[in-house]
Curated annotation (Swiss-Prot):
SUPFAM superfamilies tied to this protein: F1F0 ATP synthase subunit C
Assigned GO CC terms: plasma membrane; proton-transporting ATP synthase complex; proton-transporting two-sector ATPase complex, proton-transporting domain
Identification of the protein by name: ATP synthase subunit c
Compartments in which it is found: Cell inner membrane
Keyword Transport: yes
Keyword Membrane assigned: yes
Marked site positions, Reversibly protonated during proton transport: E89
Pfam families xref list: ATP-synt_C
Amino acid sequence: MKKVLFLLLACAAVAFAAEINAPVEQEAINVWIKAFSVLAAGLGLGVAALGGAIGMGNTAAATIAGTARNPGLGPKLMTTMFIALAMIEAQVIYALVIALIALYANPFIVLQ
């Protein structure tokens, strides 16, 4: 955790180290925004997919354990599991949509 925090602080220090009155071309700024958008989209989607995979694994494990304890509830638990899996997958799809918006319809890029 300390390494990640140090890396983020180092990136922030580089980002804020530019002179305030220095003339900067808008195209150069757009390149940096695009680069950081790709990084943010990749990291965000990766974290969402990791969380979704962990959630799906826990859901399946709990359903299997519940069915093993009470086989009569198997079909009911299976239905509930599929609903839960759909909700978990929806969250990952929402992260994908946000990542695609950040990549292809970025509101921070100034068009000339």
